[in-house]
UniProtKB/Swiss-Prot annotation:
GO terms for biological process: DNA restriction-modification system. To A.pernix APE2001. Its EC number is 3.1.21.4. It catalyses: Endonucleolytic cleavage of DNA to give specific double-stranded fragments with terminal 5'-phosphates. It is an enzyme of class 3 (hydrolase). A putative type II restriction enzyme, its methylase would be M.MjaORF1200P (AC Q58600). Keywords: DNA-binding, Endonuclease, Hydrolase, Nuclease, Restriction system. One of its GO terms (molecular function) is DNA binding. This is Putative type II restriction enzyme MjaORF1200P.
């Protein structure tokens, strides 16, 4: 599970970036990717995440857009974890591999249709619980596979 790229996309909250890092690094994810961070997420969230990563011997990558992350990382598959209203299928945790990019949307509006075309849209639970809730459940389920 350490090789898997976990991404927070389209966030404006420094606190969300920090908590995302705590959860992901807590599950021994080696590299966190952040794309399209704005406002306090970019100004103070990313520096806080870098500090956390350095102290833990982990990595953080920051890209302007999701396309940049896909171009550089070259994942085998891209999973966009959203809510049921925009994603057709429930996550099958067995289809997620070590070299995949798993993207969680930090904005309450979710992914746009254009963003969903970049990968496989999946949902975890029936109701909207946000990026942090989805991340925690996702990583817990993935940790059971090991």
């Amino acid at each position: 599970m350490r090789k898997m790229f976990i991404c927070l996309h389209n966030t404006y909250s420094a606190k969300q970036v920090e908590e995302f890092g705590r959860i992901a690094y807590g599950f021994d994810i080696n590299t966190i990717v952040v794309t399209k961070a704005t406002a306090s997420a970019a100004q103070s969230g990313i520096p806080t995440l870098h500090k956390m990563a350095y102290k833990l011997g982990k990595n953080v990558l920051f890209f302007e857009e999701l396309d940049d992350a896909i171009e550089v990382l070259r994942p085998e598959k891209v999973f966009l974890i959203g809510n049921k209203s925009i994603c057709d299928e429930k996550v099958d945790f067995n289809e997620v591999g070590e070299n995949d990019l798993v993207v969680f949307c930090g904005a309450s509006t979710g992914f746009t249709k254009l963003e969903l075309e970049k990968g496989l849209g999946r949902y975890i639970v029936e109701n909207e619980i946000g990026a942090l809730g989805n991340l925690a459940i996702f990583l817990y389920e993935m940790s059971k596979k090991i």
